């Protein structure tokens, strides 16, 4: 069976070697037919602590690393929008 690969946004990078990735999907409401956004958070392994909050990343399913971590970050899809810029004042 192939490994699942998902794309999501890093919402937390506070723990060591771990990031929390929020993956959104769109589903159709069974009765009303409206398209609704559903989301789920995954704990993913980040060996080098390279990924920061706000970045869009690709995660891959792996064998369990810890109680919560069964995903690892493969690569960065898009840089975060909240990057700090230094200014001379």
From Swiss-Prot:
Highest rank taxon of the organism: Bacteria
GO molecular function: rRNA binding; structural constituent of ribosome
Family (UniProt): Belongs to the universal ribosomal protein uS17 family.
Subunit annotation: Part of the 30S ribosomal subunit.
Lineage start: Bacteria, Pseudomonadati, Pseudomonadota, Alphaproteobacteria, Sphingomonadales
Gene: rpsQ
This protein's record includes keyword Nucleotidyltransferase: no
GO biological process: translation
A cellular-component GO term for this protein: cytosolic small ribosomal subunit
Protein name: Small ribosomal subunit protein uS17
Keyword terms, alphabetized: Ribonucleoprotein, Ribosomal protein, RNA-binding, rRNA-binding
Pfam family, one: Ribosomal_S17
Gene3D superfamilies reported in the protein's UniProt record: Nucleic acid-binding proteins
Main function: One of the primary rRNA binding proteins, it binds specifically to the 5'-end of 16S ribosomal RNA.
Organism whose genome encodes this protein: Novosphingobium aromaticivorans (strain ATCC 700278 / DSM 12444 / CCUG 56034 / CIP 105152 / NBRC 16084 / F199)
């Amino acid at each position: 069976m192939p490994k699942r690969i998902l794309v999501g946004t890093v919402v937390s990078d506070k723990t060591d070697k771990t990031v929390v990735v929020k993956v959104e999907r769109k589903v159709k409401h069974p009765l009303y037919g409206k398209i609704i956004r559903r989301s789920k958070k995954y704990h993913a392994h980040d060996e080098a602590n390279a990924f920061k909050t706000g970045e869009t990343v690709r995660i891959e399913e792996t064998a369990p690393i810890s109680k919560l971590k069964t995903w690892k970050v493969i690569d960065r899809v898009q840089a975060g929008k909240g990057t700090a810029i230094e200014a001379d004042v």
